């Protein structure tokens, strides 16, 4: 049996009044259902959907974010501000939940292996969903240390599927607590262009949480330090600087500047535009910095935007 600090779970969200509560698929005795049982449940439910397109988003949270209080805030912001939007085609949201204790370094050392374990069932779900909806798209949204989980998922999926052409639409790296060198030669994600069509990294230059991580790891963090040389990384990678986005719906984020992917309306809208390019709003406008794929966004009002900048 897994220890509580190594538990991997598939979650779903249930609306209870004004709250969006994280739930899990359980047996009658309160234990988690097996992954095989989850596969059967997913297959049955996905097959019944009437939409021609029912795109899938795998979401992976960060360190200690399996806690109910954090999940409540995240679920509320993301459902109200993104998932439930009328034009959002990603109607199947699968939460990859991993339990962690307070030992940051110890948990960080386990995350790649956790991701590799998740990859086995994800691989099955990719095939099941493709069989049921041939035109469905799949994307990943990862936050903070959840991006380390994704690195494990990526490594194992590439081994299982042995694809040289992208089979995932988007991978969104929100405030990634991983090495800034991950896309460079010999980095874990050196071949991300064989995995997805678009790899989008959000960074904040004053991310307090990642500043602390940098001190602990003694290495640059992708979500803090960004990318130095775009000529040495895959061409499908974009970097979006959100340091100028001040508005937040979470008081805690005013200090940490780390959870903007859920609390910042302008960042949520940018994520919506990435996932739904045909229904994208003309805002936020992306400003090109020193490279066409090094961009920034800032808080703006809808009425002030008159044109749409395509990816």
Language model feature labels by segment:
Residues 1-50, 63-65, 71, 75, ...:
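Lipolytic serine-hydrolase domain surface
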Residues 55-56, 136-138:
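Generic beta-sheet signal
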Residues 118, 142-146, 150:
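Gly/Ala-rich beta-loop-alpha elbow adjacent to hydrolase catalytic centers
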Residues 54-62:
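Short beta-strand element of the alpha/beta-hydrolase
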Residues 67-68, 148:
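Loop/helix-junction capping segments adjacent to catalytic residues or to phosphate/diphosphate-binding pockets
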């Amino acid at each position: 049996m897994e220890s509580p600090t190594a538990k991997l779970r598939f979650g779903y969200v249930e609306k209870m009044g004004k709250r969006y509560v994280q739930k899990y698929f359980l047996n009658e005795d309160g234990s988690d259902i097996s992954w095989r049982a989850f596969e059967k449940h997913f297959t049955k439910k996905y097959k019944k959907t009437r939409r021609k397109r029912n795109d899938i988003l795998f979401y992976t949270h960060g360190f200690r974010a399996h806690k109910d209080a954090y999940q409540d805030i995240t679920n509320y912001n993301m459902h109200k501000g993104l998932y439930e939007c009328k034009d959002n085609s990603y109607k199947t949201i699968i939460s990859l939940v991993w339990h962690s204790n307070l030992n940051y370094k110890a948990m960080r050392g386990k995350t790649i292996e956790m991701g590799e374990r998740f990859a086995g069932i994800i691989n099955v779900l990719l095939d099941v969903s493709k069989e049921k909806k041939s035109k469905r798209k799949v994307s990943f949204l990862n936050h903070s240390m959840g991006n380390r989980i994704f690195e494990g998922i990526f490594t194992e999926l590439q081994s299982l599927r042995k694809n040289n052409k992208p089979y995932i639409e988007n991978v969104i790296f929100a405030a990634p607590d991983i090495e800034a060198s991950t896309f460079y030669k010999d980095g874990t994600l050196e071949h991300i262009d064989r995995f997805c069509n678009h790899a989008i990294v959000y960074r904040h230059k004053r991310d307090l949480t990642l500043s602390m991580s940098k001190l602990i790891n003694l290495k640059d963090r992708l979500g803090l330090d960004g990318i130095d040389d775009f000529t040495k990384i895959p061409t499908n990678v974009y970097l979006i600087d959100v340091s100028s986005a001040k508005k937040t719906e979470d008081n805690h984020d005013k200090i940490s500047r780390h959870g903007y992917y859920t609390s910042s309306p302008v960042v949520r809208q940018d994520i919506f535009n990435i996932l739904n390019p045909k229904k994208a709003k003309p805002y936020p406008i992306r400003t090109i910095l020193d490279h066409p794929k090094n961009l920034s966004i800032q808080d703006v009002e809808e009425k002030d935007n008159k044109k749409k900048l395509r990816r």
